[in-house]
Amino acid sequence: GSIAVVIVLIILLRMYANRYTKVGPNEVMVISGRQHRTMEGRAVGFRIVKGGGTFVWPIFEKADILSLELMTLDVRLKEVYTITGVSVNVDGVAQVKIKGEDQAIRTAAERFLGRSEEEIKMIALQTVEGHLRGIVGTLTIEDIYKNRDAFAQKVQEVSAGDLANM
């Protein structure tokens, strides 16, 4: 009798220990499979754990990890045309990351969960490149070279909106 109870308790403790999942401070765990309410009261099919741990119910839930690390994008555009029709090559670096705020994490989970870091980088890079092409097309070559800081600021401002919606 009591040996059976002890064995059952050990099995339950092991199951709990095996299903308790943790993430570091630079990661978010997205647990999907059951309905949860957001702080705003909206029903969603997942819950979020930032830098901690939680029990993931076997069979009913699945845990995925989303990185909050800074990602560096190497931007290299060839033959981008300015407003005057002059072809220029544009090289630069952009740094992007998923914000640690709940709404930004929910949005990123809906867009990127299950994708590799390389796939996420490629999507962000294509977004930045598209905006970069559009901005270069509105400037002269003199504007680009004389006002590099203003040019970089404009690229950041225009890209930020689309990147935030990802």
Describe the predicted segments one by one.
Residues 1-166:
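N-terminal hydrophobic membrane-entry segments
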